[in-house]
């Protein structure tokens, strides 16, 4: 409690002025913009907002996702309910979260959570036909009856019930990239019910073609030119995803669901590189070519069973089994006219498996209190293999691409984790609720291969979630939570760089078998105001995080080489303010215009392990600003809009032992025009930005020794060009 009070005091000092300013601004806007609508959703006493299907009828939506886009403030709910400080260091959220947990993505289908991590409720929103929806709920309160917990809001999609019904939705699309390449794709889904069985099937193959061009200019410490590098990368892929969800109602008190997903993503990627060495009076040109194919295949099988007892208590079991296989190969050649000479070979494979089962029992303690108790068992396994071959003149091997073996690393990591939890929900009054969680976690991580060891961990993770409905439209929420992040087991072993923008001078990433989990105490306060008559929503979130064992780069240098690896670099703090607004422009006579804005301000502080100086967390930045507009024109069966997002420059820096990399603001835009036309089909035209990104990389000799000595300054920018897309959608 002492830690909490001191932390909250620091937050108050940092943000009291900003909070007052924005709160005043929000209420001023709310008063001025509250204009009535002809059709309004209903708001229950428990602050649940219900949108019947008739609310969306005039917009002729194609999918559930289209319906949600018309709801003011839906961006807050679709953010996973994490608030302004969601994610980041020390967080266990997202598809990489620890096990199943009680959260998920805060989307329910017919009041039930889909048992999956890669195949959750949010993934189904663009696949389910709007014609199958009876109503949509935005649940702003807490309840022991909810299948997910912990989010600021929960979206519940309730589908129509009938003895026999089905609906097919399909989409044909084509992307045009800036090199005039046309890449087709398609989606199809079937949603239906037959007696006690409900089902959902879908398949999609999406274009993922990309042409990336970049230029890099490098200078030496004295300002003289070093070299210039031009790169052109082509990537061609069409990932295929198949999904099936089935439900069976044995009786009014017994339900079961099965969920399946399989996906395949085989990428063909090639890179051409032109290097101009400017250290000579006449620049020396050299050419390189790389082949970088990547093949991925994954599947997931999950399910749940629920039984409701006569006294209203519930027993529920969920399980998930999944696997992902990933193979990345990199072969680099020096090019001389038509001759190619291979000088680098990398083969990196990973196989990840999870086996999770979660069981809980929920019952009423008193009329206004409920308790859920349960246990979760999760096994996670990772098998890795890395082969690195170089042209050194030594003995060669076919397994290393016909080059000399340099690295042959193999490893296996297994985590066996047990989680025991109790969740108490207390409706203090018809306007106040408090949900408290106590979770104990016990795990063992074993490693074998190049390094063999076993380590045990245990954590106690409490959480308090308090909500006060000041009015049905105005809600205050505050949470205090201890969180533990999932480790990336790939950091334990030596691996290859596979991401775009990786360092040409670094062939592999070192592993660190001594990593421990990031932990955090997370404090958040949230104020949400829903304007009368569905005119809009204003949401303000203030957060402060105390971080322990933050993961960053640490020194693992040898006598011969300066090396770093991901490791725990100490404690840190992160704090910020997020304001979201979603307003209908009824005051301009345009009630079907929805203006959405977002302002995210954040800062952080940690001690750099190499220099001992205070700095921000790697790649966290200072926040971003977003604005979007959607205009529905029902009389013409059309809508149009745009979304723009820009990050603040000057603080998005990645820190390493021998370099720093500063990234510019991530500006992006997206616009569309959509209309219902010939054949009753929906035609949608989209335009996406050219994705220009810039980076300044400063190389040092070794930052652990004084200032390390400046070695090189690199400035680079890349673009993937604008993308135009045409989509044709229909249902029957």
Predicted features along the sequence, with ranges:
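Outer-membrane beta-barrel signature, preferentially recognizing the C-terminal barrel domain
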Residues: 290-298, 350, 411-413, 484-539, ...
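Gram-negative outer-membrane beta-barrel transporters
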Residues: 543-546, 565-650
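N-terminal periplasmic accessory domains that precede
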Residues: 64-67, 93-97, 107-108, 124, ...
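Extracytoplasmic beta-strand/coil segments of soluble accessory domains associated
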Residues: 39-42, 65-117
């Amino acid at each position: 409690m002492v830690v909490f009070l001191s932390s909250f005091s620091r937050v108050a000092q940092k943000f009291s002025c900003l909070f007052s300013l924005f709160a005043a601004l929000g209420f001023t806007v709310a008063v001025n913009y509250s204009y009535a609508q002809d059709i309004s959703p209903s708001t229950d006493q428990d602050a649940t907002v219900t949108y019947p299907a008739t609310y969306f009828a005039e917009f002729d939506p194609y999918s559930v996702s289209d319906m949600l886009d018309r709801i003011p403030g839906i961006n807050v709910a679709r953010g996973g309910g994490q608030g302004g400080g969601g994610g980041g260091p020390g967080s266990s959220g997202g598809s990489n979260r620890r096990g199943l947990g009680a959260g998920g993505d805060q989307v329910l289908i017919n009041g039930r959570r889909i048992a999956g991590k890669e195949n959750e409720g949010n993934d189904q929103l663009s696949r389910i036909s709007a014609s199958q929806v009876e109503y949509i709920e935005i649940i702003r309160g807490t309840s022991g009856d909810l299948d997910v917990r912990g989010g600021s809001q929960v979206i519940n999609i309730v589908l129509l019930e009938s003895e026999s019904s089905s609906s097919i939705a399909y989409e044909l699309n084509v992307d045009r990239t800036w090199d005039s390449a046309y890449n087709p794709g398609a989606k199809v889904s079937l949603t239906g019910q037959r007696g006690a069985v409900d089902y959902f099937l879908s398949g999609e193959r999406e274009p993922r073609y990309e042409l990336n061009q970049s230029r890099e200019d490098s200078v030496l410490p004295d300002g003289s030119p070093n070299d210039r590098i031009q790169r052109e990368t082509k990537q061609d892929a069409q990932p295929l995803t198949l999904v099936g969800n089935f439900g069976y109602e044995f009786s009014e008190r017994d339900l079961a669901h099965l969920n399946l997903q399989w996906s395949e993503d085989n990428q063909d990627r090639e890179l051409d590189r032109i290097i101009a060495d400017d250290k000579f009076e006449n620049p020396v040109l050299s050419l390189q070519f790389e082949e970088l194919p990547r093949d991925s295949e994954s599947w997931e099988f999950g399910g749940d069973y629920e039984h409701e007892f006569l006294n209203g208590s519930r027993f529920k079991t969920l399980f998930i089994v999944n696997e992902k296989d990933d193979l990345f190969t990199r072969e680099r050649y020096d090019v001389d006219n038509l001759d190619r000479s291979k000088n680098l070979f990398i083969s990196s494979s990973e196989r990840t498996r999870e086996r999770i089962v979660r069981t809980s029992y929920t019952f009423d303690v008193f009329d206004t209190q409920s308790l859920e108790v349960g246990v979760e068992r999760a096994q996670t396994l990772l098998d890795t293999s890395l082969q690195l071959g170089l042209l050194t003149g030594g003995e060669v091997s076919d397994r290393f691409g016909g080059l000399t073996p340099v690295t042959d690393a193999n490893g296996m990591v297994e985590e066996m984790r047990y989680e025991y939890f109790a969740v108490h929900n207390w409706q203090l009054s018809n306007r106040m609720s408090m949900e408290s969680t106590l979770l104990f976690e016990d795990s063992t991580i074993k490693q074998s291969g190049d390094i063999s060891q076993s380590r045990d961990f245990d954590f106690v993770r409490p959480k308090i979630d308090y909500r006060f409905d000041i009015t049905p439209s105005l809600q205050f929420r505050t949470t205090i939570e201890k969180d533990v992040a999932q480790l990336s087991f790939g950091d334990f072993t030596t691996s290859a760089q596979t991401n775009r923008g990786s360092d040409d001078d670094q062939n592999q990433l070192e592993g660190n078998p001594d990593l421990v989990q990031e932990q955090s105490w997370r404090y958040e306060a949230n104020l949400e105001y829903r304007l009368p008559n569905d005119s809009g929503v204003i949401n303000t979130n203030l957060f402060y995080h105390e971080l322990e064992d933050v993961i960053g780069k640490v020194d693992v240098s040898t006598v011969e080489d300066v090396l770093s690896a991901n490791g725990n670099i100490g404690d840190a703090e992160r704090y910020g303010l997020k304001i979201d607004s979603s307003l209908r422009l009824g005051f301009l006579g345009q009630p079907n215009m929805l203006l959405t804005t977002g302002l995210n301000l954040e800062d952080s502080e940690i001690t750099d392990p190499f220099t001992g100086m205070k700095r921000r967390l790697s790649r966290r930045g200072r926040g971003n600003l977003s604005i979007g507009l959607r205009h529905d024109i029902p009389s013409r069966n059309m809508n149009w809009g745009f979304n723009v997002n820009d990050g603040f420059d000057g603080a998005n820096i990645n820190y390493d032992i021998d370099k720093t990399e500063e990234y510019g603001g991530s500006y992006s835009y997206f616009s569309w025009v959509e209309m219902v036309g010939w054949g009753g089909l929906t035609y949608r035209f989209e335009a996406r930005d050219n994705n220009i990104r810039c980076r300044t990389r400063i190389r040092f000799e070794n930052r652990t020794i004084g200032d390390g000595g400046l070695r090189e300054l690199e400035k680079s920018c890349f673009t993937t060009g604008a993308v135009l897309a045409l989509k044709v959608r229909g249902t029957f």
